[in-house]
């Protein structure tokens, strides 16, 4: 803790940042229960708690009273762990079940990716800006999120001489992340009510449950009534750690040829590990332990990311950038509404819209958080969950990186 120009500067360690995120999440969950309107519109708990924390901290920093610096090393670790579990869910056997819907959704999202870039580039040039700023405020930040923004920002600065490219991309990604979290679940809720979509709980009224396969063994401690999942957690944690370690090596190698988010290497290794297990039958990588790691890392990663948002930086955006971001928001809402009709006005379509808004203006974690908020109220959609995970966290990142690299060279 020190001071600079009269402003108190507090450095929060990595473990303290995790602790704050956990408390923030439960505060958001408590607030959601206490305010019926928040429950009605399925606003995610990490958003409620995290946005309040971010707002307070941003005000303190804006008025030069206090600046909080979070150590994000464990946030990065949690992000890698979460996306590694996504890779471990990428079973080719399951993907084939996604079939035409998976391919169709990927095609539609690729179109959105192109539209985001054309909109950003067009508006930037109309206002006399270098079109690269439009790309940075297009699919780099919108579809790519903070990770892709942090990767391509310096790349654009060094390759095309775009001054402040990293700041523009990260600020746009921050804006997109906030908007995606605020409108994703409420938009899905509106679709369900407006078009009277039949939900899983209306069909078979299942008990609330986590996204956990039921055909798994659990270890029971002798003398205890409740099962413990220590062996499964240990096995899952070991597999995730190995995939992350090997993935870091792969990411470093791939980084010599193409700019990709840090988690891509871990996801590729995880997908290989999963499918080797599926086809060889030698081991199984799914289970309650893997599900627990995925959910815990998702909640903490998203909450930590929101806690660290510099909301006051949005006030410093130039008018042209604000216009581009407003245009991207309108495009996303209209496109999501069109997607709902394209995919048949079903509950799966609703969930694809909620998840699509999340990762098309922020990150896959945001999309899954939006979907989880809806699933808690109306029931899960396993197929939509899988498709959003595969397309948002893996397939579209590869396509987006290639697309941005190509369009940036125009």
Q: What is each of the regions a protein language model found here?
A:
Residues 9-23, 69-83, 132-139, 257-269, ...:
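Structural signature of hydrophobic alpha-helical transmembrane segments
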Residues 24, 51-59, 72-99, 268-277, ...:
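Hydrophobic transmembrane alpha-helices of secondary-active transporters
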Residues 26-39, 85-97, 187, 272-287, ...:
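C-terminal ends of transmembrane helices
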Residues 31-47, 64, 68, 194, ...:
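Flexible hinge motifs at transmembrane-helix junctions and intramembrane kinks/re-entrant loops
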Residues 77, 92-121, 237-240, 292, ...:
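Entry/N-cap segments of selected transmembrane alpha helices
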Residues 122-129, 173-217, 338-347, 392-410:
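Juxtamembrane and boundary regions of transmembrane helices in multi-pass small-molecule transporters
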Residues 123-168, 175, 187, 205-207, ...:
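Alpha-helical membrane segments and immediately flanking helix-loop junctions
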């Amino acid at each position: 803790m020190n001071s600079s120009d009269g402003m108190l500067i507090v450095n929060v360690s990595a473990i303290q940042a995790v602790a704050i995120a956990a408390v923030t999440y439960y505060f958001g969950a408590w607030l959601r229960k206490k305010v019926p309107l928040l429950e009605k519109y399925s606003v995610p708990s990490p958003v409620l708690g995290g946005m309040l924390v971010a707002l307070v901290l941003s005000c303190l920093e804006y008025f030069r009273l206090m600046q909080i610096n979070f150590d994000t090393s464990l946030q990065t670790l949690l992000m890698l762990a979460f996306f590694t579990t996504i890779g471990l869910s990428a079973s080719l056997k399951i993907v084939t079940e996604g079939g035409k819907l998976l391919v169709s959704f990927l095609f539609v999202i690729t179109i959105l990716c192109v539209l985001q870039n054309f909109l950003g580039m067009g508006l930037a040039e109309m206002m006399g800006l270098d079109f690269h700023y439009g790309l940075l405020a297009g699919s780099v930040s919108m579809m790519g999120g903070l990770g892709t923004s942090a990767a391509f920002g310096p790349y654009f600065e060094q390759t095309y001489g775009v001054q402040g490219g990293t700041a523009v991309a990260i600020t746009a990604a921050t804006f997109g992340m906030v908007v995606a979290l605020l409108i994703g679940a409420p938009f899905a809720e509106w679709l369900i009510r407006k078009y009277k979509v039949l939900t899983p709980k209306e069909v078979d009224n299942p008990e609330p449950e986590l996204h956990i396969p039921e055909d798994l063994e659990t270890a029971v401690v002798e003398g205890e009534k409740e099962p413990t999942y220590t062996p499964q957690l240990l096995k899952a944690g070991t597999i995730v750690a190995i995939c992350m370690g090997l993935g870091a090596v792969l990411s470093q190698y791939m980084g010599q040829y193409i700019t990709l988010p840090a988690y891509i290497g871990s996801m590729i290794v995880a997908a290989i590990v999963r499918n080797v297990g599926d086809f060889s039958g030698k081991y199984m990588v799914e289970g309650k332990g893997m599900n627990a790691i995925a959910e815990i890392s998702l909640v903490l990663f998203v909450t930590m990311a929101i806690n660290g948002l510099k909301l006051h930086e949005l006030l410093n955006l130039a008018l042209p950038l604000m216009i581009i971001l407003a245009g991207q928001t309108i495009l996303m809402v209209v496109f999501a509404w069109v997607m709902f009709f394209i995919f048949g006005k079903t509950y799966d379509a609703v969930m694809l819209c909620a998840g699509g808004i999340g990762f098309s203006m922020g990150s896959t974690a945001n999309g899954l958080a939006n979907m989880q908020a809806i699933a808690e109220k109306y029931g899960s959609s396993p197929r939509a969950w899988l498709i959003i995970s595969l397309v948002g966290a893996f397939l579209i990142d590869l396509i987006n990186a290639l697309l941005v690299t190509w369009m940036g060279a125009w």
